[in-house]
């Protein structure tokens, strides 16, 4: 089941991430059309009207003209298309076209922090947005928010170490949300159940 768009928006707002938050979108997210300020959003790789597929996060830092894409699974472009028929290049291009130079830098997550048995992709996106909000020039690593979780190459996800690491990540993520989001605390029982480990049987 995972998390709904409404739940994710409420979590983001309860974390105090108001300035620059564009909202929750499906695969038709238009990109960052105002590149004069930092902005961020959570985007589904599918059509939300038809149920949605997988949550990822996008952010744009206007100071460094950097476009960040955070996928909790760290899938390659090929895997994103194979699994979800999702491509982000249109979003990247529409953002670049708003700049006079037509030039922006892409930084994309390449490591997995979430287990494939989990439905917590939206919650991991909230963690990334908090990281970007407070550390917009280095949200992917090297700050106390995102460094709460550890990454592993996606090819190692189903290894014993990969399963152990990503399961630990989810436990730390839940503890962080309980500590920092009043909305998550209020709805913790249901949200933890809906995003739990072993929600999907992708490994034994």
Curated annotation (Swiss-Prot):
MF term (GO), any: DNA binding
Protein source organism: Frog adenovirus 1 (strain ATCC VR-896) (FrAdV-1)
Signal peptide positions on this chain: none
Keyword Disulfide bond: yes
Activity control, per UniProt: Requires DNA and protease cofactor for maximal activation. Inside nascent virions, becomes partially activated by binding to the viral DNA, allowing it to cleave the cofactor that binds to the protease and fully activates it. Actin, like the viral protease cofactor, seems to act as a cofactor in the cleavage of cytokeratin 18 and of actin itself.
Protein name: Protease
Annotated EC: 3.4.22.39
UniProt-listed Pfam families: Peptidase_C5 (PF00770)
Self-association state and partner proteins as the record states: Interacts with protease cofactor pVI-C; this interaction is necessary for protease activation.
Induction statement: Expressed in the late phase of the viral replicative cycle.
Family recorded in the similarity comment: Belongs to the peptidase C5 family.
Misc remark: All late proteins expressed from the major late promoter are produced by alternative splicing and alternative polyadenylation of the same gene giving rise to non-overlapping ORFs. A leader sequence is present in the N-terminus of all these mRNAs and is recognized by the viral shutoff protein to provide expression although conventional translation via ribosome scanning from the cap has been shut off in the host cell.
Entry keyword set: Autocatalytic cleavage, Disulfide bond, DNA-binding, Host nucleus, Hydrolase, Late protein, Protease, Thiol protease, Virion
Catalyzed reaction equations: Cleaves proteins of the adenovirus and its host cell at two consensus sites: -Yaa-Xaa-Gly-Gly-|-Xaa- and -Yaa-Xaa-Gly-Xaa-|-Gly- (in which Yaa is Met, Ile or Leu, and Xaa is any amino acid)
Active site (catalytic residues): 54, 71, 121
Protein function: Cleaves viral precursor proteins (pTP, pIIIa, pVI, pVII, pVIII, and pX) inside newly assembled particles giving rise to mature virions. Protease complexed to its cofactor slides along the viral DNA to specifically locate and cleave the viral precursors. Mature virions have a weakened organization compared to the unmature virions, thereby facilitating subsequent uncoating. Without maturation, the particle lacks infectivity and is unable to uncoat. Late in adenovirus infection, in the cytoplasm, may participate in the cytoskeleton destruction. Cleaves host cell cytoskeletal keratins K7 and K18.
A single GO cellular-component term on record: host cell nucleus
């Amino acid at each position: 089941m995972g998390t709904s768009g409404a739940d994710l928006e409420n979590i983001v707002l309860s974390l105090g991430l108001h300035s620059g938050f564009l909202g929750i979108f499906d695969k038709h997210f238009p990109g960052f059309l105002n590149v004069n300020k930092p902005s961020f959003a959570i985007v589904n790789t599918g059509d939300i009207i038809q149920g949605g597929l997988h949550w990822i996060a996008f952010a744009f830092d206007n100071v460094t003209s950097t476009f960040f894409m955070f996928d909790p699974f760290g899938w390659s472009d090929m895997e994103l298309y194979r699994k979800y028929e999702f491509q982000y290049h249109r979003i990247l291009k529409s953002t670049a076209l708003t700049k006079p130079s037509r030039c922006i830098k892409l930084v994309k997550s390449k490591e997995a922090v979430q287990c494939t048995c989990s439905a917590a992709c939206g919650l991991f996106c909230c963690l990334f947005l908090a990281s970007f909000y407070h550390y917009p020039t280095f949200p992917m690593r090297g700050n106390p928010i995102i460094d709460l979780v550890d990454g592993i190459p996606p090819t190692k996800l189903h290894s014993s170490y990969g399963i152990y690491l990503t399961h630990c990540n989810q436990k730390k993520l839940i503890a962080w949300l309980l500590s920092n989001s009043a909305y998550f605390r209020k709805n913790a029982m249901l949200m933890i159940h809906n995003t739990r480990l072993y929600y999907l049987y992708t490994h034994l």
